[in-house]
Structure formats: structure tokens, C-alpha cells
Amino acid sequence: MTSKNFLSQLPPVLKLWWWIISLVVAFLPLGLHGLIIINAIFFALVIVVERKLKTFAIIFGWLLFFFWFNIVVNGFIFLPNSSALASQNENFLGHFIYSGGEQFGGVSWWSVNTRSLLRSLVIALRISMLFATSFLLTASTSIYELAFGVERLCTPLRYLKIKTQPLSILFALVFKLLPIVKGELKRIKQAQAIRGFKYGKLAFLNPVKLKTLFIPVLLSTVKKTEAVAFALQAKGYQLDNPNKTHYLQKYNLWGGIVFLGLFVLLSCLLMVNNWHLVYWTNPHYSFTFTHQNFCFFKQISSPQLLAFWQLELLAIG
């Protein structure tokens, strides 16, 4: 059952479009400030939809996990050049928290600096945006609404003689069964713990212990899938009936259009603002250089190096 809130009153097709656009926007050059703004909006929507802080804490915990994970990874990517001056390294990488980068045994030391921290934060914000928008879609949309919404969204495929009904039911089941799998996994672990089974720390690294969960979770999920299929049929959804109907529901169409339009407008404004800051105004916005960015690009003679720096700007910003 989905809770009654603003998002649950929007048409499923518009929510699917919003979800697809959000997946695309998450990888566009919004800039650090833009990603923080959109994540703050998504987190506020998560709290409004869930009406408690548990889900927000879970998504925020994943954000912190990916932030620290990317710090470790980027510490091996953005290394100071031991043959360059300290001022040149600082212009390229920003201030050092740990000034590694020296060669020892042919291997560079791990380093943490401003550039690696910014890149790690940007990647973590992009991932948390994906988590938040997927949760908002599933929490505000019932399974039969998802099925009918995907079927309507894939209507152009009918002209190519592609059946959209199996695709829609598969999409709906995948989205709705992910929380069920998590709940069944927790329930079975608690049942095994009552019987004296001890997982201990770092049990996810022990495949022998995990094997005791695979079969029970699989069987329980299959049973839930059958129950979901019966629920869909009870709501009027049948794959072999091309003239199927379902109960009419009132949706806030204009509210959905305004919501989707404002999100697209905000994303475009943030991208334009980031493009202006990074390329023309402030060279210290996404990374540090002593010259303006466009002047720095003009001084690069290698096309491959120029393309690399432009992609680097998009990745960070």
C-alpha cells in the first residue's frame, strides 16, 4: 500500500518520466552546488513521503559509504607529481590533507587532496540521487499503477509489433520485489539467529554462511511473486486480455505537469550556472588553476590532452 501524499496523486506515466529524467540529470554537469540542491530536495521528498527519518538515514548512510569508498579510489588517481614544484601540485590538486605521491618500489603512494575529495563527493551525490528517485517512485506508486504506467509509456513499441505487457509487468515486479527481498532476508536472518546461528563480523565475506540464506530467500520471494501476480489479476491486469480495463482513479494531471516542468527547469538552470562558473567565471569552482579555464584550454596544443581535460571537467562538475 502506498501512502497518500502529493506524489501518490500524480499520474504514473508522469512519475515514470520524472524518474527517467532524474536518472539522466544525475550524470549531467550540474556542479557540486547543483547536486547538493537537488539531493536536498529529494531528501525532503523522501521524508514527506515516508513520514519518518528511517529511509532518509538509510540513503544518507549509502551516500557516506560511497563517499569514503571513492576517497580511497581517487586517492590512487589524483597523485602529486614528485618532479613538479609544490606550488604546481597545489594549483592542480588543491590543498593536501595527506601529501603522498612519492615513488617507492615503482608504486605511487596514496594521496588525499582537495581534488580527490570534491570528485568523491560529487560521485556520492550522483549515486544518492539515483537511490532517492528510485525510492520515491516505488513508495508513491502501487504495483498495478507501475504496470499500467510502463505499458502506456511503451505504447510506441506496439507499432513495431513488440508486446509491451510482459515488459510492463516485469518492470513493476522488479521494482516492487526489491524491498520484499530485503525484508525476507532480514526475517530469515532473525529466524536463524534465534536457532543459534551466528553470523559474526564480516559474514558477507563468508560464502558458506551466505548459502544458508539463498534458498529460503529465493523460495519466499517466489511465493511473494505469485501473490503479487494474483493481486494484479484482481486489479484487472491480464496479459492475455488486450481489452483489459482497471478502476478509474483520479490523478492530479496539472500538478504532475507543473512538478515535472519545475524539475526540468531547475536542472537546466543549474547546468547553465555550472557551465558559466566552470568555463568562464571562476577557475577555482571545480578545480584550481592560476589562469582562467578558457585561457588554459587555449594553451594546450595536444587534442587528446584537451579532450581529457574537458571530460574531466564534466566528470567533476
UniProtKB/Swiss-Prot annotation:
Its main location: membrane. The chain crosses the membrane at residues 18-38, 58-78, 92-112, 130-150, 165-185, 202-222, 253-273. CDD domains: EcfT. It is found in: Cell membrane. GO terms for cellular component: plasma membrane. Keywords: Cell membrane, Membrane, Transmembrane, Transmembrane helix. It is a multi-pass membrane protein. Belongs to the CbiQ family. It comes from the Bacteria. This is Uncharacterized protein MG302 homolog. PANTHER family: PROTEIN ABCI12, CHLOROPLASTIC.
